[in-house]
Amino acid sequence: TSRRQRQMCIRDRDLEERNRARKKAMRLLEHMDRTEKGLYDRLLRAGFSEALAADAVAYVKDYGYVNDARYATNYIMYRIHDKSRQKIFQELQQKGIDRQTIQSAWDEAAELERPDERKLLRQMVEKKYAPGSSLDEKEMRRLYGYLARRGFRSGDIFSVLEEMDIS
């Protein structure tokens, strides 16, 4: 019976650890919405094994507490007027959301919000330079790099700069 008692103790400890991981996952989601990957990574950093972290993510996912499609839609709705489509896609992919889920969320958000990337691009340029400004080559390179890093296409950048008579 002592062998059987040891096995019971091990099983009890495993169940306690599993429950601890699940509770931690739910506590993490109380503070902010997270992606599956974000929650999984956070549980690993908290010291849980890969198996326990995966179990906890599956547990909260089954109850609908974590939902990558919902996260992507909310993320896009919040940032659609501040960032380019490409930049938003890149950030969501870094958070572990697959491209198809992001595209579906983008289509849903774009129907409601109608993003105008050229207007956003114009606003970003106006923050730095007035229309009609004359820039030297170094300033122009910096401005172009700044806008390109934010995910704007080069054709759009050049045409907006031309429209604003910035050269």
PLM regions with names:
Residues 68-70, 89-149, 162, 167:
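Strongly charged, low-complexity linkers/loops
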Residues 60:
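Helix-turn-helix DNA-binding segment
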Residues 64:
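Glycine-centered, phosphate/nucleic-acid-interacting loop/turn motifs that mediate DNA/RNA or nucleotide
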Residues 27-38:
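Short capping segments at the starts of secondary-structure elements
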